[in-house]
Amino acid sequence: MTTIAAVSPLDGRLLGHFPVSKPALIQQQLTKSRRAALLWRELPVTERVKRLSPLKKQLLDNLDRLCETIRLSTGKVRTEALLGEIYPVLDLLAYYQKRAPRILRTRAVSTSPFAFPAATARIERRPYGVVAVISPWNYPFHLSVAPLLTALLAGNAVILKPSELCLPVGQLIVDLFATLDLPDGLVQWVIGDGQTGAELIDARPDLVFFTGGLQTGRAVMQRAARHPIPVMLELGGKDTMLVLADADLKRASAAALYGAFCNSGQVCVSVERLYVQQACFAEFLAMLLKGLSKLKVGHDPHGDVGVMTSARQIDIVQAHYEDAIAQGAKASGPLLRDGNVVQPVVLWDVHHGMKVMREETFGPLLPVMPFSDEAEAIKLANDSDLGLNASIWSQDIIKAERLAGQLDVGNWAINDVLKNVGHSGLPFGGVKQSGFGRYHGAEGLLNFSYPVSGLTNRSRLPKEPNWFPYSASGYENFKGFLDFIYGEDSMLQRGRRNQQALQAFREFSIFDWTQRWQNLKLLFSWTRDD
């Protein structure tokens, strides 16, 4: 395969041909990225922010063109392209414009006035170097630009490998960054399928950030382990929605439809398991089915549910539907498929032996299951190998937040769905087999750098008390010194019984408070971590 034909899932139209990146070219790109990274990392964080900030105007000035390119490449409706792809990037950039310099600032760390009387300690943040961002097809703009932008702010160069299903969006991204005042080669991309992704990892970037399915995530991790290269994995979910009997059922049913069928269910935090308390199950299901009948599905750019992006994913949805029906599930209707248009379906009379309740569906199926009490709800929700996101619905916020604390997930929301993933200040990521690593928030920015710790000793003495030579008396003095520092009775009592040890250490200026005060002016130039 030398080229990839980009075809729109909307109507099959050809969007362009893209040349597949060869291993030799990828290696050349990595070399170029390393040169750019050396220049970029030397810039202060404030200067990096300044050079990346014009991206905001580029996005705002080209909203219609961006949304249309995303719509043609993915099949999602225009509003979802705007709110699910462009808005989160704008908000993330605005968040880091204000906070990145402080988040990445050198931090002072307290030192013991006894063991380190003449020393200061600090933690610096350094960029990895070259980051490979391997992004998915469901949100090809947001899930490419968010890690790309974060990696750049942290001081790295980036090579993007977008999904082969959405190459026009990848081209759009590199074109946008080409308009910025960045070192040549700081943002590059490679073109191809999974094999190209493997070749990118074999070129040995310094960090790999992958978003996608569990199976591919394992392959990425195995490939990176050969070298070894650190990885961050944002994988799938089998996300739950718990509706308690005291919930606002009208709001909750509307949220369930949106949470399950937004982007045709192709969202890592889609509602894929809906548990409703038995006392309100029948009423809630009736409201759900009524709302389902009103959804506008198809090619309308201003409809509710667009088309699915991947034919292979449609086959998985079909298999999950057929398995559930074969095991006795009831459905709101048949799984109607017209090209890449798949009609959303609600399922009930389901159980955890069905694929639709255990495996990630990533499509417009919503299984609904009753529970008797809170304990059963938590047990059902946690009965999964995945742990990405969840929501709890109740008018008793204290109760809902208490239950949220029992969920094995990386993220949760009370009385809302999906929206928490778009909060730029909240670190997002999963637990269990939903991956590890975070993006968004301070944690997300820190994850694209590594800590370097430093200790500066300004003592003018010829030696430290712990240096050679050792002696028996020295051992006894150290014992007394440790008892004085860490003993749990009063300092006066500890001082009386350890007078000999304390006297022995005076020659080493253990209590040289003058030097300690001299170090304070250095501490005020950094931020403290405690």
Curated annotation (Swiss-Prot):
GO terms for molecular function: oxidoreductase activity, acting on the aldehyde or oxo group of donors, NAD or NADP as acceptor. PROSITE patterns: ALDEHYDE_DEHYDR_GLU (PS00687). It comes from the Bacteria. CDD domains: ALDH_DDALDH. The keyword Iron does not apply. Pathway: Carotenoid biosynthesis. It holds the Pfam family Aldedh. InterPro entries: Ald_DH/histidinol_DH, Ald_DH_C, Ald_DH_CS_GLU, Ald_DH_N, Aldehyde_DH_dom, Aldehyde_DH_NAD(P). Its EC number is 1.2.99.10. Keywords: Carotenoid biosynthesis, Oxidoreductase. The active site is at E234, C268. GO terms for biological process: aldehyde metabolic process; carotenoid biosynthetic process. The keyword Oxidoreductase applies. It is an enzyme of class 1 (oxidoreductase). Disruption phenotype: Cells lacking this gene produce 4,4'-diapolycopene dialdehyde in addition to the 4,4'-diapophytoene precursor. Signal peptide: none annotated. It catalyses: all-trans-4,4'-diapolycopen-4-al + A + H2O = all-trans-4,4'-diapolycopen-4-oate + AH2 + H(+); all-trans-4,4'-diapolycopene-4,4'-dial + 2 A + 2 H2O = all-trans-4,4'-diapolycopene-4,4'-dioate + 2 AH2 + 2 H(+). Involved in the biosynthesis of C30 carotenoids. Catalyzes the oxidation of 4,4'-diapolycopene-4,4'-dial to yield 4,4'-diapolycopene-4,4'-dioic acid. Also able to catalyze the oxidation of 4,4'-diapolycopen-4-al to yield 4,4'-diapolycopen-4-oic acid. Belongs to the aldehyde dehydrogenase family. This is 4,4'-diapolycopene aldehyde oxidase. It comes from Methylomonas sp. The gene is ald.
